[in-house]
Amino acid sequence: MEIKIHRGLDQIGGCITEICTDSSRVFIDFGQNQPSNGKAATPEEDTLMVADIIRNNEKEHQAVFYTHAHEDHVGLFRYILLEQYIGEGSKELLLIKYRTLLERYEMAIDENHQLQEGSKENEELQEENYRTTKDLIDKLKAFKTWKRTALKESPSPITIGDIRVTPFFTCHSIYDAHMFLVEADGKRIWHTGDYRQHGYMGKALFPMLRRYATNIDVLITEGTMLKRKDKCIHECEVSRKMESVMQAFKYVFVLASATDIERLASIKVAAETANKPLCILSLFMKRTMEFFTERQSSLSRGLFSFAPLFYTDKLYRKLKRRGFAMVVGTSQTDRIKELLDKLPQEETLLIYSSWDGYYKNAEQVKANSKYKEFREMFHNVVDIHTSGHADKATIRKVIETVCPKEVICIHKEAGASL
């Protein structure tokens, strides 16, 4: 068995790991590079890079496995012709995302046709976006999946030639993340993907490792937080901090990810405790919340059950009187601006609940200035966030628990070490 880290030893995100035998090979993640990893590649450059990696060292049996649905882990799927595997929940999240985008492009095309005076160039761009997104949906539909294993049940391995890959559910800042046990040639590799212990679902991390991550030859672990001094508070503490500031302001906006089930739960609990109606105005967030509720409500004793108000202008007067907690994303900037113009700024707060690098890091801002611009719309802003990644103490404990013969650290900044 051989391991090759194509990308990830000295960068966060964009990871590509290859594990092979004489007759078979699997890739774990084919992630899109993040802005902090240098100049963004063009689609043509990504196509060539993926083709070169796959063409070199081809085997009779081959497949790609994805740990979760963040773009820096799954973003290059569009260029891959091999069989691709992902968790059932992750596949559904990606389909929700691209189907919602497809509807948006469809509406834009219809509006252009109705106006009959829109620019030809813009119309062609929207039609190209529509075709591309439709192709991505078709490609995603072909993904093979595994179902998350019920508590107290052992997950089933997936066989690719003489390699066995077994997925294990883990806690991360997106729904349906997994670790992998890869077995072949009498060797056992444990690939962690992205993980943490300080989320609601993180308590299962070490019981799982003690039970399944035994006799491991090589541990491949993420190291995102190795050079960072951020304190990783628990999601419960995130919720308590949010509840406290929600008590102090009448109108509260919370900038958070629509795919982070645990953060959405923290916001929901904070809003309930502060006696504020939970609102959203994103169709994508509405659909992810419905999906989470359908899949996880009963399993979580209601923690992951969501029933937000979908904001419309008809609700404005009622919410103006009562106040609200509204979960938002940067794609809703224009609608938020309209609403902010109607609200007293001294009673309005933004809880920024995302990584602060999106507005502090110059490379990130250059690549996507929306987070910084979104913050600047508000007079009152407070950061309440915790990482989706394991802190140094958790990484150390994982290594001590697994006790592998060798450790490879990926998904880490250049110069970071164990």
Regions found by a protein language model. Give the residues of each.
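His/Asp/Glu-rich metal-coordinating catalytic cores
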Residues: 1-65, 70-262, 266-273, 277-281, ...
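Short Asp/Glu-rich motifs
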Residues: 96, 264, 290, 393, ...
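C-terminal regulatory/interaction regions
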Residues: 11, 269, 273-275, 304-418
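Positively charged, amphipathic N-terminal segments that serve as targeting/anchoring signals
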Residues: 280-317
